[in-house]
């Protein structure tokens, strides 16, 4: 058996060097381990009995650790009446150690102030409750002041909280658990994670600045708040929520307005967001001494302690925080909607830019984007000045130079656009004329594939128009979906559908059984009725049955819900009257999904002539010359002459000028060359006479026997003129009478 001070052994070393630290060594046989009483930062805590050399027994606390790090080293350097006393170390089983300290009979301050014993303590001791508050606050401040200013090395506790302050049998506060503490050899130390969320300072949460003694000052303010309110700080919030409230929103613990000014100011000075603005422990200790010496303030604080304002103020703060959370959630959702709209807008703009690089073949269909890209391409060959090209592009958009305007531009117009160099204007005018000439030359000569496509489109439209009656009746149905997220939050969206008034109203010749075939586009606009501002981006969708606005809208029913929805229905080209229908409704309740309105609409349809055929003048396509030197695919609806259309149609279908295909014409010619009988019976009562084809012998002279007879019988000037002549005016073959004909070998 040995005393705590007589026997010393080497048990640990510092983290930064090989310097060996000596701790009082207590024999394991002298220690009897008792019940488990708590958990420290890096080990479990047990009660126990220590047999002293004189045979007496002492109740102790044993903290079991795996490695002797900073805690034992720090405890061996400090000794103060308000800091737990360190006795030494004891070797446990294996490589474990026991840190032996004094035992606090009343447990932690946290357990005491939240127990029934705390409620009866003031009355049983004969004093007032605020006297106890000031006494405990002074004792804790005295211990922290010793660590900061009077110890061998400046020590930052870093985990000061009511659970790390214990009470002995005389209800004296003692600071314990130095597992996360650090020596402060300079003005600050590097930040590292340690502590408990509700008691942590902003700089420890963010780990953005070096830690100073001001970190413990923040935690001390929270402990003082616990003693006064007897409430758990940030009780209903998660650690992440606490970190966000402190660092991002700057929300500190609630202090009732009825709190006396000196006490309120003391806690506020501990919770400054900037560490250097906080009070130090010496200033806090002095303020507590002045507070205890002012009886008037003490009476005022005692009266305040009897009120229930803490709970009321905490509940009020919770409501404000919840409202702030909902506002942040709304803002987040709005930002997501805006981000989605921005991405959609960027996607559309990119599509416009891509479309500008591939303009339609019809120059009259060009937009400012197509014109701008075309002009930039042409001018880019003669000028490499980007600023110049940007100015010209801006002028094109400012003056709305579309394809139709581009074809009619002059050199003066180009100069007005900012093309001041003569060479650039000449080159641009040359390309504009070439563009116009190409457009004009190809105006009536579309490709066969394009002409066929246009004719088929027109044929389909005419057939569809002829299949419906002149007038039809449909019903437009506007409604809304509602989803209940929780007691107060709702999500909703609107929809539009259509149907025939009655099943008997469906046109008999209609191929489509759906009334939505008469609707082209449906647009939704949702506005706040109170502010008249849009809640989300207006959305349009092509009708293919039932349509809805794409995004869900989230609102809180606690607010005054008053939403205006505008549904605009645009009809297909086949509908002549009305061209569109608008449904406006105001929604004041979001309890359930429902139909807002059923609007009956009478539609008048366009009809086409039944005698219309494909040969009706149809639009054709004129390719456009592009500065890149190739033709683009596109459509331009113009009209060509019937002769040209007939020629292109025959060429497309493979027919010749006789109205026959090449195959039919070849077959007929073959039949004519083949000998056949004079008569061929096709039917019993029908006889077709086919003349017998005989091959006549070709004559080599025009004064043959047959010719002479013919000329004798018909000696007219016309017959003489019909005689065959060769070049030079003489007969093809002319032999003298009596001479033999020439022989051909």
Swiss-Prot record:
It is found in: Cytoplasm; Nucleus. Residues 693-745 are annotated as: Disordered. GO terms for biological process: signal transduction; stress-activated MAPK cascade. Pfam families: PK_Tyr_Ser-Thr, SAM_2. Its EC number is 2.7.11.25. Residues 366-438 form the SAM domain. Widely expressed; expressed in most tissues, including intestines, muscle and the nervous system. One of its GO terms (cellular component) is nucleus. GO terms for molecular function: ATP binding; MAP kinase kinase kinase activity; metal ion binding; protein kinase activity; rRNA binding. Gene3D superfamilies: Phosphorylase Kinase, domain 1, Transcription Factor, Ets-1, Transferase(Phosphotransferase) domain 1. It catalyses: L-seryl-[protein] + ATP = O-phospho-L-seryl-[protein] + ADP + H(+); L-threonyl-[protein] + ATP = O-phospho-L-threonyl-[protein] + ADP + H(+). Residues 735-745 have a biased composition (Basic residues). Belongs to the protein kinase superfamily. STE Ser/Thr protein kinase family. MAP kinase kinase kinase subfamily. Stress-activated component of a protein kinase signal transduction cascade that promotes programmed cell death in response to ribotoxic stress. Acts as the proximal sensor of ribotoxic stress: directly binds to the ribosome, thereby acting as a sentinel for colliding ribosomes. Upon ribosome collisions, activates the stress-activated protein kinase signal transduction cascade, leading to programmed cell death. Acts by catalyzing phosphorylation of MAP kinase kinases, leading to activation of the JNK and MAP kinase p38 pathways. This is Mitogen-activated protein kinase kinase kinase zak-1.
């Amino acid at each position: 058996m040995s005393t705590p001070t007589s026997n010393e052994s080497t048990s640990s070393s510092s983290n930064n060097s090989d310097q060996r630290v000596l701790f009082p060594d207590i024999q394991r046989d002298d220690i009897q381990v008792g019940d488990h009483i708590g958990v420290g930062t890096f080990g479990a805590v047990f009660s126990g009995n220590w047999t002293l050399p004189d045979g007496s027994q002492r109740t102790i606390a044993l903290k079991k650790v795996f490695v002797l790090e900073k805690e034992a080293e720090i405890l061996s350097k400090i000794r103060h009446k308000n800091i737990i006393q360190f006795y030494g170390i004891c070797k446990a089983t294996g490589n474990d150690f026991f840190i032996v300290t004094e035992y606090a009979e009343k447990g932690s301050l946290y357990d005491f102030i939240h127990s029934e014993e705390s409620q009866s303590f003031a009355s049983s001791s004969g004093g007032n409750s605020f006297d106890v508050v000031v006494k405990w606050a002074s004792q804790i401040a005295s211990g922290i002041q010793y660590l900061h200013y009077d110890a061998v090395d400046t020590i930052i506790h870093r985990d000061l909280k009511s659970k790390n302050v214990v009470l002995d049998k005389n209800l004296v506060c003692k600071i314990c658990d130095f597992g996360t503490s650090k020596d402060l050899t300079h003005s600050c130390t590097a930040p590292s994670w340690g502590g408990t969320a509700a008691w942590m300072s902003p700089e420890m949460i963010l780990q953005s600045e070096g830690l100073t003694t001001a970190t413990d000052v923040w935690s001390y303010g929270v402990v003082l708040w616990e003693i006064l309110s007897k409430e758990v700080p940030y009780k209903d919030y998660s650690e992440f929520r606490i970190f966000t409230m402190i660092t991002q929103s700057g929300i500190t613990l609630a202090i009732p307005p009825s709190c006396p000014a000196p006490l309120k100011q003391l806690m506020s000075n501990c919770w400054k967001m900037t560490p250097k603005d906080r009070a130090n422990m010496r200033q806090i200790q002095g303020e507590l001494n002045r507070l205890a010496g002012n009886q008037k303030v003490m009476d005022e604080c005692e009266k305040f302690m009897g009120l229930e304002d803490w709970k009321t103020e905490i509940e009020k703060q919770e409501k404000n925080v919840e409202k702030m959370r909902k506002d942040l959630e709304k803002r987040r959702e709005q930002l997501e909607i805006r981000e989605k709209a921005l991405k959609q807008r960027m996607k559309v703009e990119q599509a416009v830019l891509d479309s500008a690089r591939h303009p339609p073949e019809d120059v009259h269909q060009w937009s400012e984007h197509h014109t701008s890209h075309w002009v930039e391409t042409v001018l880019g060959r003669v000028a490499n000045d980007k600023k110049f090209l940007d100015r010209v592009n801006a002028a094109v958009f400012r003056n709305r130079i579309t394809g139709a305007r581009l074809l009619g531009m002059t050199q003066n117009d180009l100069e007005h656009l900012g093309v001041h160099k003569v060479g650039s204007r000449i080159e641009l005018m040359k390309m504009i004329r070439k563009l116009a000439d190409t457009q004009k030359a190809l105006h009536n000569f579309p490709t066969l594939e394009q002409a066929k496509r246009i004719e088929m489109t027109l044929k389909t439209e005419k057939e569809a128009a002829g299949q419906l009656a002149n007038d039809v009746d449909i019903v437009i149905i506007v409604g809304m979906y509602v989803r209940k997220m929780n007691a107060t939050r709702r999500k909703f969206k609107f929809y539009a559908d259509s149907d025939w008034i009655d099943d008997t109203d469906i046109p008999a010749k209609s191929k489509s059984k759906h009334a939505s075939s008469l609707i082209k586009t449906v647009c939704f606009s949702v506005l706040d009725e109170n502010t008249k501002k849009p809640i989300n981006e207006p959305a349009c969708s092509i009708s293919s049955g039932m349509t809805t606005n794409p995004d869900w809208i989230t609102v809180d029913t606690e607010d005054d819900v008053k939403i205006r929805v505008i549904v605009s229905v645009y009809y297909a080209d086949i509908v002549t009257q009305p061209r569109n229908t608008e449904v406006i409704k105001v929604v004041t309740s979001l309890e359930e999904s429902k139909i807002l309105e059923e609007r009956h609409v009478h539609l008048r349809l366009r009809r086409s002539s039944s005698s219309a055929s494909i040969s009706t003048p149809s639009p054709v396509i004129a390719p456009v010359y592009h500065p890149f030197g190739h033709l683009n695919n596109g459509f331009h609806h113009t009209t060509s002459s019937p002769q040209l259309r007939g020629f292109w149609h025959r060429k497309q279908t493979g027919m010749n000028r006789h109205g026959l295909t090449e195959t039919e014409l070849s077959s007929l010619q073959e039949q004519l060359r083949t000998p056949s009988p004079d008569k061929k019976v096709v039917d019993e009562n029908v006889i077709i006479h086919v003349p017998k084809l005989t091959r006549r012998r070709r004559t080599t002279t025009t004064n043959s026997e047959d010719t002479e007879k013919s000329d004798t019988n018909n000696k007219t000037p016309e017959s003489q003129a019909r005689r065959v002549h060769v070049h030079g005016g003489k007969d093809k073959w002319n032999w003298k009478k009596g001479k033999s004909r020439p022989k051909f070998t």
